[in-house]
Each structure stands twice: as structure tokens, then as C-alpha cells.
Amino acid sequence: MDTFILTYSILFLALFIESIHSRYSRVAEHIRTRKRPDKELTEEEFKLVFHRSSTEEIDYDFVNLTTEITEIERKVLFTIDDKDYHLKLTRASSSVIPSGTLIRSAILWTDNQTHFHDEDSTDEHWGSSHIYEDLDKMATFLLRDDDDFTRYDGVFGGGKDMKVVGSLPARLVNIYGANYHFIYYANGSVSDVILNGAKQVVGSANTQAGLNNFYPKLLVLVDYTLFKILNKSYEETIRYLAIFWNAVDMKFKKFETPKINIIITGIIVPKNEGALKHVYDARIKSDMQKVNATKIITNSEHFFGANFSTESYFDNYDATFTMASLNDLEGQTGLAYIGAICKNNHNNAYVKDSGVFSGVLAAAHELGHLLASDHDEDVGCPGEINYNTRLTGTIMAEYRNNNVSKFIWS
């Protein structure tokens, strides 16, 4: 009897291993014989993965992610161009978008006024239980478990080496399996100016008091130009913001004192083009893809004026961040007053983002301004340093060196 059970068990195990081997052999053969994976995508699926039109050529890698799960971490292993990557992901202690974050849509009505409406509040799909990170590799991921597979969406690396990881649409999971992911570059930059009058609003009691812990509460507004890139999907937009702002938050985790943790207490997403009037009115009428970024900030003083809290029901925030996919006339990728957090009429920041996390560094830079940090060059610090024999950029440098792959606080 024991011999029969042992023989049956060995046979079952052999058949199981053979089925797994056969499955992966079919997938490998499928990849070899079919056209490029991105050419398998429909236009809708292409936009879901890359946040761009399928007419654009994307330089990407199609990679099989292997996951080893231990009690304390997820080890994610993959290879790109013969280089092995090892990420040690641990569950985030908190999410920048906590449960209960108020999400509202904005719409421009025929009365030329912006009106606000409740949308579904945040839920477990982008909470801390689904956010994993590797601080050493500057990696942050939103994980989604599907049967025996885990889908990874997020970013890793810094500077010119920052990459986006995108999971497969459901249809392609049935072809390739969910372990395969698209990986491509997220090219971002930083270029801003100190706003006129910024020196007069430097500092506040909170930023100068030597706190041990600081929790900047942000109201994030997604302009329609970015919302369109995110396929006009509220769920996709919130997932994107969860990854984006967790990536920004990670840059502040290098601070020992004070400890800085970002909390998003509100999100506004527009339903039509002109809903965020402070952005729309700053666009160049002869070329609506261009904008005067400085006007976004000056227009914000009126948009977030006396009636905003009453009409929108947003009043629990220290600063606003408006994200848009527009090209500034002077090439600025972000703007904020120095030391203006918690200061009405000046606590508004702008960041350019193209839907591929290109604005992460700029967002950290502008939040640094709000928290009273000057440009490094303005206070006698270099914008680049040799760190461990490697040329390294600083987050608060006025201009970014696009050849730098690592950024630190000076």
C-alpha cells in the first residue's frame, strides 16, 4: 500500500512538473514565433500599458518576473540585456492615499463655474497592503494578486535609469501568463525658477520648529490633459497617483530628522477640459498644448480662494499640487513658492507629468521648496557631487543633468 501511494505521488509530481514545463515552453515558443508583444496590443490596451498612442515607437523590454516570497519580503528577480536585477520588496508601512481620502470630480458648467461631485472613495486596491517598496533600489510597486500570479505596476531606479513596470492586460495574460511585464524608461527632468516674491513668504512655524515628524497633507489635482493620458479612468488615475506619490514619498525617507511622510487627503479629477480653470486659463490659446506655468500658480490664488473650501468641501490640506501634461513656454517642469506650505494663497505647486512618472523628481523638488528649501546653488551647495566615486545629482539643484542616474538630498 505504501509503495502504491509513493508511486502514485511520484507520478503525480512528474505530471505536474511536465505540465508546468510544457506551459512555459509554449509561452517561450509563442514569444519566439509571434510578432512583438506591443504589436499584439489593441489601441486601448497599448494606452493602458504605455499611456501613449500605438503610433509611437516605444523602447521597451518584455520581461519575465520571478518572485520568491519569504516571511519578511518579496524577492523579485528579472534580467534585462544580460543584467540581473534583484529587488527586495517589503510591504509599505502606510500608503500616501489612506483609507477615507476624499475623491471628487470637477466639471465646468454652462455658468462658467467649476462644480464638484463625490466619486468613489479609496479602497483596498491602492492601500498600504498593496504597496511594496525597496528603498535601496528606489522601487515602489502596486501589487495585484490574480489566482496564482502577482501583477506588478510601478517604478524602480533613479534619474536617467528610472524605469516603469507595467503588467499585461487581461487578454495577454491568457497568452503569456501574468509573470511577463513590460518595462520601459520614464524620462523626467527638473527645471524651475524661484517665483517673484517667494523670498517674502519663506518659512512658517511648522517648517522651522525642528519637528521630529512632519506629515505634509496634500490636495492633488489631475488636469484633464493628464486624465486623458490615463484613459479618462478614475480607477486607473487613482492607482497611478498611489504609485507616483509613494515614489515621491520614498525620496523623503532618506531624511533622519525630521521624518517626513506625505499624506494625500484629497484628490480632484476633472470631467471636462476647462474644469480646472487655473490651468485652462494659463494655456496658450494659439497652441493649447503649451502653458504659462507661472500663470497656473498666480491663477491658483483665485481658484483656491475664499469660496473653494465651501464649494469643494476640501479644507484639510497644507498644500495643493496640480499635475498636468503641458509644455511650459520656458521649459519649466514645476513651480512652487519657498516655505509656503500651510500659507493660504501661496501654498500651491505645479508639476508637469506625462503619465509615465516623469514628474516624480520634479514633485519632490517642488515639495522641497514648499518646505522652505532653496535651490542648492543659491545657498552655496553644488547641484552635482561625487558620491561613492559616482557623479550624483541633488534633488534641489536648479537644473537637472540628464546623464545622472542617482539623486540625493544635499
Curated annotation (Swiss-Prot):
Pfam families registered for this protein in UniProt: Reprolysin_5
Location in or out of the cell: Secreted
Record keyword rRNA-binding present: no
Active-site positions on this chain: 366
Main location per the UniProt record: secreted
Cofactor: Zn(2+)
InterPro entries: MetalloPept_cat_dom_sf (IPR024079), Peptidase_M12B (IPR001590)
GO annotation terms (biological process): membrane protein ectodomain proteolysis
Activity regulation: The gelatinase activity is inhibited by EDTA.
Transferase recorded as keyword: no
GO molecular function, one term: toxin activity
Domain Peptidase M12B: 214-410
Cofactor note: Binds 1 zinc ion per subunit.
Reported tissue expression: Expressed by the venom gland.
Subunit structure: Monomer.
Function according to Swiss-Prot or TrEMBL: The recombinant protein has gelatinase activity. In vivo, injection of this recombinant into fifth instar L.oleracea (host) larvae results in partial insect mortality associated with the molt to sixth instar, with surviving insects showing retarded development and growth.
Record remark: domains: The N-terminal section (alone) shows no toxic effect when injected into the host. This section may function in stabilizing the catalytic part of the protein, or in directing it to specific target sites of action.
Family label: In the C-terminal section; belongs to the venom metalloproteinase (M12B) family.
Name of this chain's protein: Venom metalloproteinase 2
Gene source species: Eulophus pennicornis (Parasitoid wasp)
Record lineage: Eukaryota, Metazoa, Ecdysozoa, Arthropoda, Hexapoda
